[in-house]
């Protein structure tokens, strides 16, 4: 029986951990030592200025890089008529790192103390520095978008929101792009759920439920 105290005591014979950016820590609280580590990546967005929105009438994506589970900056026309540009994928300094000023020493230490993170940095240093440049420079962000829509100009970009991706990283420095489960008696820990989680949320939920119910027959 699992007892959870947050927000009041809850007891249950079966637990499914889908804690996202904190899933590895919840697994440790349950007595496991997960092989993967959650490393936060921030995805930053811009909106196109109204005078440039007419350049995009649908979805425009770059050819994906098979080395990464990220799609690259792309353009999406929303139901409101606005056009969203992004996201990039820059290492966040906190698991709540929606801005550069959001810094958690605990989260940063968790990333930097993990050997898999250093293997990732060594393997893809140039790509990582490019993402940082696009995060800090509107001109660099716009340059990436001009590969898709050459008529876009720097001044067409308006800063918008951001999100944090709970990216599971293996000890070999590889970014996971498929489900990663770990079990404990009476518990299933979901350490990685593939993107696009919102678009495929019902199917992902069905798969997690199927795996969670397997031991029950």
Q: What annotation goes with each model-predicted range?
A:
Residues 1, 17, 113-117:
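Short hydrophobic/aromatic-rich motifs at helix boundaries and adjacent loops
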Residues 2-103:
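Flavin-dependent oxidoreductases
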Residues 100-106, 111-217:
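C-terminal catalytic lobe of FAD-dependent flavoproteins
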